[in-house]
Design a protein with these regions (language model features):
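Metal-associated gating/positioning segment near the N- to mid-region
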Residues: 40-110
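Divalent metal-coordination and catalytic microenvironments
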Residues: 6, 20, 25, 39, ...
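Mobile, glycine- and charge-enriched loop segments
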Residues: 50-52, 59, 214, 219-221, ...
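N-terminal metal-binding scaffold of metallo-dependent hydrolase/deaminase domains
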Residues: 1-33
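Active-site-proximal flexible loops/turns
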Residues: 12, 55-59, 136-138
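Short amphipathic alpha-helices and their capping/turn segments at secondary-structure boundaries
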Residues: 32-40, 71-81, 140-155
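Metal-coordinating catalytic core of metallo-dependent amide/deamination hydrolases
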Residues: 94-97, 101-227
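Short, intrinsically disordered, charge-balanced linker/junction segments flanking boundaries
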Residues: 26-28, 226-230
Length: 230
């Protein structure tokens, strides 16, 4: 099949008016075109390395849950329509989440299972990006279980302790928690508890080393996330 008289966005250059031939879903030939440009553009599929969208698809409003298969199917259609061909679903664990709530061990594991179970029927190459907060020591065991099961494609580490890094402004963080469904009192209490229980640097580095060794052992790429650059 030929796509002719289109603008082609390639890895090393742009062909303003070209033609592309595909065979069995694979690009077989790219040439210049002498025809009248159609105004259409062909570009490589986008890769989304960090998508927060899966959690909102499942729970668009606090305590309003969509069925897993419906949410995953809807997300897949939206990503494909936007030109995203590989999407890393960002999932994480929260120490403040109760059983079954967003970012609890149960909820996050269910998200991963839903993606893995529906993978054959989806348009987009869906992968799992686990974001590990170095302050949450108890989550290491859960992460290890997912790595052993081969359910994780990327791990990033971060420190979301309030008062530094991304959450330097406490009032902004309180507002963010309130938009997620918590009252101001609940948000302030939760944030103060996190600040009071902040881990010493030695413990943070120990958690980082343990997670690094797990990723190395299972051949999973590792990255940093929300670094403090000031």
């Amino acid at each position: 099949m030929w796509l002719s008289d289109v603008k082609l966005i390639l890895a090393d250059r742009i062909i303003e008016n070209g033609a592309l031939r595909s065979e069995n879903g694979v690009i077989a030939e790219i040439v210049e075109s002498a025809g009248q440009p159609s105004g259409s553009t062909v570009f490589p599929g986008f890769i989304d390395m960090h998508g927060d969208m899966i959690e909102l698809e499942l729970e668009p409003r606090p305590k309003v849950d969509f069925p897993m298969d419906v949410a995953v199917g809807h997300l897949d259609a939206r990503l494909a329509a936007a030109g995203v061909t590989t999407a890393y679903a960002g999932v994480s664990f929260s120490r403040s989440a109760k059983d079954g709530e967003r970012r609890s061990f149960e909820h996050t594991s269910a998200i991963i299972r839903a993606l893995k179970e529906n993978i054959q029927g989806l348009r987009v190459d869906h992968r799992i990006h686990v974001r590990f907060d170095m302050t949450y020591t108890d989550a290491i065991a859960a992460l290890e279980g997912l790595l052993v099961d081969g359910a994780v494609d990327l791990v990033s580490v971060m420190d979301h302790t309030p008062g530094q890094g991304q959450y330097r402004n406490i009032e902004n963080l309180i507002g963010f928690r309130m938009r997620g469904g918590k009252s101001e009192e609940e948000a302030r209490t939760e944030i103060q508890m996190r600040m009071d229980s902040a881990l010493p640097v030695e413990k943070l580095l120990g958690n980082l080393q343990n997670v690094s060794l797990l990723c190395l052992a299972h051949g999973v790429a590792m990255a940093s996330h929300d670094d403090d650059t000031e």
